[in-house]
Curated annotation (Swiss-Prot):
GO terms for cellular component: cytoplasm. UreD, UreF and UreG form a complex that acts as a GTP-hydrolysis-dependent molecular chaperone, activating the urease apoprotein by helping to assemble the nickel containing metallocenter of UreC. The UreE protein probably delivers the nickel. Keywords: Chaperone, Cytoplasm, Nickel insertion. The keyword Nucleotidyltransferase does not apply. GO terms for molecular function: nickel cation binding. This is Urease accessory protein UreD. It is found in: Cytoplasm. It holds the Pfam family UreD. Belongs to the UreD family.
Length: 295
């Protein structure tokens, strides 16, 4: 007897292949003699460090993270990790903006996870370029910093929604952002933000007010009220307060700066100014601007 074959329409559909491009890097830095050495750099995919730089006399290690693709499409995932041993000092930055590209009707996500672990007496400055969220993106961004003892951290996260100047506003899509700072297992700062183009939060005055640039700077330093007032006046004289709103807040052992506006240039300029003005308070030495910012 011949077997009865099922109709083609009743056969289970072959699952569509998922596109996924993973990349990651884990750095280990330790104090060796008179400078901080990059002890190991374990990576997979297109994410790596070319070589460490030492532009400062105290041996602080400057690291440029290179990601040749330049951005993440739907399905991509990027992991950045660094561990600093006792007494290590490092400044980590990126040569260009990160990008989360969009795709119509995408159900998969793309994302970047950053995690730093700092031992006692270590110091990390995380100063990346901005991340651009393209129209139609479906992204997640996470930054977590674990501090031990008297470890110090200075970092910022800058979000650019769409590319208005290029006629590509952020009309559709979403991106969930999470920022965390912990010291000895206790939270210093935890914040969750969801950038959703169609939401009231994106449009209303109590939310983003249709601004296309949103940024947060956090630093484990203590400033006086007078110092903060003087810094606000200096930002105004610098000409960066006309395109957005600035908020400077001193919490217990944590200094927080926020920018909400429409100029990535003014945001970067203001953040760099604050970093240069406070670095001596933060780690006792003048700012040494990474050369890659000027190329």
């Amino acid at each position: 007897m011949n077997a009865i074959l099922p109709k083609i329409s009743t056969l289970p559909a072959k699952p569509a292949p998922t596109r996924e491009w993973l990349a990651g890097i884990d750095l280990l830095l330790a104090k060796r003699y008179q400078r901080t050495a990059l002890m190991s750099s374990k990576h997979f995919g297109p994410l790596r460090v070319q070589r460490p730089f030492y532009p400062e006399p105290d041996g602080c290690c400057h690291i440029y993270l290179l990601h040749p693709p330049g951005g993440l499409v739907i399905g991509d995932n990027l992991h950045i990790g660094a561990s600093l041993q006792q007494g290590a000092q490092a400044l980590i930055t990126t040569p260009s903006a990160g990008k989360l590209y969009g795709a119509k009707g995408a159900s998969e996500k793309q994302g970047q996870q950053v995690e730093f672990n700092l031992a006692a007496e270590s110091c990390l400055e995380w100063l990346p370029q901005e991340t651009i969220i393209f129209d139609g993106a479906n992204g997640t961004l996470s930054t977590k910093v674990n501090l031990t003892g008297n470890a110090q951290y200075f970092g910022w996260d800058i979000i650019r929604l769409g590319r208005v100047a290029s006629g590509e506003p952020f009309n559709t899509g979403t991106c969930a952002q999470r920022l965390q700072l912990w010291r000895d297992g206790l939270p210093l700062f935890i914040e969750k933000t969801k950038f959703e183009a169609s939401s009231n939060m994106h449009r209303e005055k109590w939310g983003l007010q249709n601004a296309n640039t949103c940024a947060t700077l956090t630093a484990t330093l203590q400033l006086t009220r007078d110092s903060i007032d003087e810094m606000l006046e200096a930002l105004a004289q610098l000409g960066v307060t006309n395109t957005g709103e600035w908020g400077l807040t001193q919490k217990e052992s944590l200094f927080i700066v926020r920018y909400l506006g429409n100029s990535i240039t003014d945001c970067r300029k203001g953040f760099e100014f604050i970093w240069q003005q406070t670095r001596a308070v933060f780690n006792g030495k003048p700012a040494e601007v990474p050369r890659i910012w000027r190329t």
